[in-house]
A protein has these predicted regions:
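Glycine-rich helix-loop-beta junction characteristic of Rossmann-like nucleotide cofactor-binding loops
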Residues: 82-83, 104-108
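Short beta->alpha connector loops at strand-helix junctions that form conserved
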Residues: 118, 137-142
Length: 180
């Protein structure tokens, strides 16, 4: 299947959070909505077909994740990383921010230092701060190749100097899309 990534779909005025939120807040029309991970490409026909098939059942109750979900994740990890994972390693959460909060409270204590690599999705810092942990920054470096890279010397220094207990690793990085 081919995709048309050149098709421009104007979503303004459709209650689209990405664009209409700024307008409702009195921001300029040309403000770039870099604060939300929302694509402007048309959804794949495979996704549309799956949604239509589910909607045609006429029931919109709560669903449970089936074995097929684990098999898809495990297969991807093995194909791309040659890593066999176990099913009990996967934890279902209602979203990334909730998962970050679980991670912080499960693996650190109040006052512990957590390493955050900027630029990154703002809840990585917000969840850390809101749970009374200390944010230690290891800022990513924009290289000559116009890609962000980890400053490994600073990374090591920050871990030792601040006795970092946890690294919030966003991979791929949201906002740059880099994969480490």
């Amino acid at each position: 299947m081919t995709y048309n990534f050149d098709e421009i779909i104007d979503r303004r005025g459709t209650d689209c959070l990405k664009y209409d939120f700024a307008k409702r807040r009195g921001k300029p029309a040309d403000v770039l909505p870099l604060w939300v991970a929302d694509m402007d490409f048309k959804t794949s026909s495979y996704v549309e077909d799956a949604l239509i098939e589910r909607a045609e059942q006429g029931i919109f109750g709560y669903s449970d994740t089936q074995k097929v979900y684990f098999n898809a994740v495990a297969g991807w990890m093995e194909r791309h990383h040659h890593w066999k994972i176990k099913e009990d390693w996967l934890i279902k959460t209602p979203g990334v921010v909730f998962a970050l909060a679980l991670e912080v409270t499960a693996f650190t204590k109040v006052g512990d230092s957590i390493l955050v690599q900027q630029p990154v999705y703002s809840p990585f810092s917000e969840v850390t701060r809101d749970n009374d942990r200390v944010i230690v920054s290891n800022d990513l470096i924009l290289g000559d190749d116009n890609q962000y890279h980890i400053d490994m010397a600073d990374f090591e220094q920050q871990i030792v100097e601040h006795e970092v207990k946890l690294l919030h690793l966003c991979n791929p990085t949201n906002t740059s899309g880099n994969v480490f």
